[in-house]
Structures are given as structure tokens and as C-alpha cells.
Regions:
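Glycine-rich ThDP/TPP pyrophosphate-binding loop and its adjacent helix/strand module
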Residues: 99, 145, 151, 159-167
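Conserved catalytic network of the ASCE P-loop NTPase/AAA+ motor domain
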Residues: 23-27, 53-57, 99-105, 161-164
């Protein structure tokens, strides 16, 4: 049971990295999870609940293209969660991840980094390429102005959730 979390700024290459990995593996034992924003029912649940159904069973590899760490990044920076929800997330995540390990799930967490100049170049490429334009969202355009805020949120997330058994790999 292997669960790999890919996180990083927009345009960091999460989707491309996942495609490169899964292209060489047996699709019967590999799943990619990229959840949309929570629906009204999911917003009433325990925060981690919507992710649990997607965790791997024996013999499976699950790759998350973004994950529960949305709360520490986009939700925090864009104001989609309350300060209390954010603090609860930072406090609860190490316990949640420890329980995954205790149940036999190997959790690997990767942060893909891209600097601001490269991110801007990739945003421009997406905007100008009809085959990539679908990747741009209104949130992406607002988030571009919050590059430093995302960096601070990332650093706080690393400090709260980097631990033996589930370290971040940058």
C-alpha cells in the first residue's frame, strides 16, 4: 500500500510528473486522484474524510495530484478556510498521517518547486497555447499575486508536517 502525494505551486509540474510515472506502470494497480473542490456535503464532513476512500488497498499505488494539503496552501492563502480550520489542520495532520503508517500505508510526500519567473513563463505559455489554456482558472490568476504568501504557507506547512515516517521531499 503506497500513497504518494504531489504538492507544489501551480505550474510546478505535478501533472506531468505523475503522467511520467504512471505511463510506465500497470494501470490495474495504480490510481491517480485529483479531487475537485469539495461539494456542499463534503464541506460538512471531517476534513480528511473525502480523501480516505481514495487511499490504497494492498498491492495498490495511489498518486494524489494535490491532496489534503490544499488546506495548508490554497485554502489558507485564498481565505477558503477559517483560521481555526487551518490551525486544526496543522495540528491534526501529523496524527492523521501517523495513522496511515500504522495501518501499513507507505506515505511519500513530494513538493515540486518552481521559482516566480519560471511560474510566470509557464502561466504565459498556458494562456497562449489553446491545448493548455484549460489548465488556467480564475483562482490561478489571483494566486499569481500571492506568490510570497504561498511561500510562507509552504514553510509553515513543512514545519508542522515534516516528521519521521512522513518527511517532505523537495
Amino acid at each position: 500500500k503506497v500513497c504518494i502525494v504531489f504538492e507544489g505551486r501551480d505550474t510546478a509540474g505535478k501533472g506531468g510528473t505523475i503522467a511520467a510515472i504512471t505511463g510506465k506502470l500497470n494501470p490495474r494497480q495504480v490510481r491517480v486522484v485529483a479531487l475537485p473542490k469539495p461539494d456542499p456535503r463534503e464541506r460538512t464532513q471531517w476534513y480528511f474524510q473525502r480523501y480516505i476512500a481514495h487511499l490504497p488497498a494492498a498491492g495498490e499505488l495511489v498518486l494524489f495530484d494535490r491532496s489534503w494539503y490544499n488546506r495548508a496552501g490554497v485554502e489558507k492563502v485564498m481565505g477558503f478556510c477559517s483560521p481555526e480550520e487551518y490551525e486544526n489542520f496543522l495540528r491534526e495532520t501529523p496524527y492523521f498521517e501517523r495513522s496511515l503508517g500504522d495501518s501499513g500505508i507507505l506515505l511519500l510526500k513530494y513538493w515540486l518547486a518552481v521559482d516566480q519567473a519560471e511560474q510566470e513563463a509557464r502561466f504565459a505559455e498556458r494562456a497562449n497555447d489553446p491545448l493548455k489554456r484549460w489548465k488556467l482558472s480564475p483562482i490561478d490568476l489571483v494566486a499569481r499575486e500571492k506568490y510570497r504568501d504561498y511561500g510562507k504557507a509552504r514553510d509553515t506547512m513543512f514545519e508542522a508536517t515534516h516528521r519521521p515516517g512522513a518527511p517532505w521531499v523537495v
